[in-house]
Amino acid sequence: MAAEGRDSRIPVAILGATGAVGQRMVSLLAGHPQLRLAEVAASERSQGKTYFEATRWILPGDVPQDARGLVVKSVEEALGSRLVLSALDAKVADTVEPLQASRGRLVVSNTKSFRMQADVPLLIPEVNADHLALLDRQQWAAAGGGIVTNPNCVVVGLAMALAPLHRAFGIEAVCVTTLQALSGAGYPGVPSLDAQGNVIPFIDGEEEKIETEPGKILGMLENLSLIHI
């Protein structure tokens, strides 16, 4: 049993904590029973400020109390938390996520950068939890680090519906139509004139992700190699 007054929850760091996705992560960690927000990191203009000072909060309600006083660190800084959630833009994630993994950090990434890399799990726990075994193949394994990615938001729901059908009968083709919120293009999102009369005109790269990611998620793991469907 943990000593009285000691917080036994797992400490977590968030990369890109001041952006829209990072703010959502901060919000979800507020009062979490097993995870504790311990560190926040963001771009150079935010470094050295408290999270409250650095963030233009766009979610309903106030900045969570346990995040307000955290001092924003550099995304390249050595972090004390072994579990790192990444909400970075892809261009930054390309270098920062491997850097943190090489320091023994387990990076759980919301970014597209490493989703299709052969030894990186593209994870939906209810569908392909066994793919976590790929972590043992990663170049950062000896240091105790690694990268796990989550899929595109449309692909999550799609793959969860397709997985039991694929396992029972096999799938030859799927036709998909999506209607997506304006926030899917990021904050501040799509200009209002472009959005009139449409859910959202276009999100770059969305169709390609829906075409490629399910094949990896539904693939089979054999001898620590992933065979896509």
Place the predicted regions along the sequence by residue.
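Conserved small/polar residues in nucleotide/adenosyl-binding loops
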Residues: I227-I229
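Active-site/ligand-binding loops adjacent to catalytic centers
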Residues: P191-L224
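N-terminal Rossmann-like NAD(P) cofactor-binding subdomain of oxidoreductases
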Residues: A2-I203
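Short, structured loop/turn "capping" segments at alpha-beta junctions
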Residues: I171-V174, L221-S225
